[in-house]
A protein has these predicted regions:
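Nucleotide-activated donor-binding/catalytic signature segment of Leloir-type glycosyltransferases, i.e.
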Residues: 292-315
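A charged, aromatic-enriched C-terminal amphipathic alpha-helix characteristic of glycosyltransferases
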Residues: 390-420
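Conserved acidic donor-binding segment of nucleotide-sugar-dependent glycosyltransferases
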Residues: 368-375, 384-389
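Membrane-proximal helix-turn-helix segments that form the acceptor-binding/catalytic region
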Residues: 127-131, 184-203
Length: 423
């Protein structure tokens, strides 16, 4: 079957979990023999492993300006073309990665409700491309915050009286991270709009039982499809000579890098894990630089035992995990899956994570969970993993087993195929 994946881009400067998840799902379906079309919105895709197959739709620059200044009349064609040009998109990409939805209320609500002059203009272009050029069997919408597109597509399919209209699959994952940052009245409108417009999706999927249960009041009949990897890319006999803690996600406060830095310093001062090292990767944006300077100051007494990778590329993912003994990303919010965990498991590397969100479901015996989520308890958990006889080896075996049996791209493709066949 032919599947159009409508996906958002973060600018590719750092490890974006949602972007990587979309890539994994698209690649899994492609490996299973399906025709996959990648349709980006907001920002261009730059990673060579995940290239677009269509033009960019809803360019972030022109969509933002349209929502701000052209609510009652269409944006002039010349301005729309200028704002969507590569130089301005490059500027937007350099500023991408904000962790706040402040100032983005109009864009967010318009995309969820599927309403507004600018939305109508831009979704028309997208629909025309899908209907006249792609003729897909399935349209996969990568976030419920794009559900206004599902509404517009369904209405168009009905208008065209298509005998076999494409099925629409929509993903629900971690929406609250963005929506709950809106003003209270806007957040209420956003959740209400998602709940209302998900009826236009033929199937709704999410990445964990935890998130399905958390959002049960909003998302009915949600299917759980765990992300899956090409585990052969991660398989290795390589292991670091010294015990090495790895952090591989966006280097910011929300993802807890400062907590890990403090825990690492505690362990070095205690000396209970000889020759302990720390490797940090995953990229960052210009907004994260002041925070990173503070982290470097904390780690300064042990800088000879710390490696911070300043560049980020999807091609380097597997290589990073082969250089660490354990992965730890002490998130400061509840996440619905955590793809860095699955990558660690595929490499046979255990994890140490806070006992929050989906982590108890995702991790199982492939590592340790700790509570509360602070540097002291993180340090204690890491110390336990490295110093308890046999525990590290048992966790490594459990990680590899979990990867093969649950987080395998072949299993993921089969699961999504089953869901599509039922709708």
């Amino acid at each position: 079957m032919k599947i159009v994946f409508i996906i958002t881009s973060s600018g590719d400067a750092y490890y974006c979990g949602n972007c990587f998840r979309d890539n994994l799902m698209a690649q899994a379906m492609k490996r299973a023999g399906h025709e996959v079309v990648i349709m980006p919105i907001y920002l261009p895709l730059r990673q060579k492993e995940f290239q677009a197959d269509t033009p960019l739709f809803f360019p972030a620059t022109s969509y933002y300006v349209g929502q701000k200044f052209f609510k009652k009349k269409p944006m002039p064609a010349w301005l729309k073309k200028l704002l969507g040009a590569q130089p301005l998109l490059d500027i937007a990409m350099s500023m991408a990665g904000t962790t706040t939805s402040d100032g983005m209320e109009d864009m967010t609500l318009s995309m969820i409700h599927g309403e507004g002059t600018t939305f109508d203009d831009m979704v028309r272009e997208m629909i025309d491309w899908i209907v006249t050029k792609e003729h897909p069997d399935v349209v996969y919408i990568s976030s419920s915050m794009l559900v206004g597109i599902a509404k517009a597509l369904k209405q168009e399919f009905k208008k065209l009286k298509m005998a076999l209209p494409p099925k629409i699959v929509c993903v629900a994952q971690d929406e609250e991270v963005w929506i709950d940052g809106l003003r209270e009245e806007d957040a209420t409108l956003a959740w209400r709009g998602i709940a209302e417009n998900l009826k236009y999706a033929d199937a709704v999927i999410t990445t964990s039982l935890y998130y399905k249960e958390k959002m049960a009041s909003l998302f009915n009949a949600v299917h759980v499809v765990y992300p899956g990897l090409e585990i052969e890319k991660y398989a290795t006999e390589e292991h670091p000579a010294n015990p090495t803690i790895g952090f591989f996600y966006r280097m910011n406060k929300a993802d807890g890098l400062d907590v890990l830095a403090e825990a690492f310093v505690m362990l070095k001062q205690k000396g209970s894990v000889p020759h302990l090292k720390l490797r940090i990767g995953g990229g960052y944006t210009s907004n994260d630089k002041p925070f990173l300077r503070q982290v470097r100051k904390v780690l300064a007494p042990y800088k000879e035992d710390v490696v911070i990778e300043d560049t980020y590329d999807w091609a380097h993912h597997a290589a990073f995990y082969k250089k660490v003994s354990v992965i730890c990303v002490p998130l400061q919010f509840e996440e619905s899956v955590g793809l860095y965990l699955l990558e660690a498991f595929a490499t046979g590397v255990p994890v140490v994570e806070p006992d929050e969100g989906s982590f108890s479901e995702i991790v199982g015996n492939a590592g340790l969970l700790y509570h509360p989520n602070d540097a002291l308890h993180l340090a204690e958990a890491l110390e336990k993993l490295f110093t308890t006889p046999g525990l590290y080896e048992q966790s490594c075996k459990a990680a590899s087993k979990l990867s093969a049996e649950r987080y395998n791209c072949c299993i993921v493709a089969e699961k999504l195929e089953e869901i599509i066949k039922t709708i």
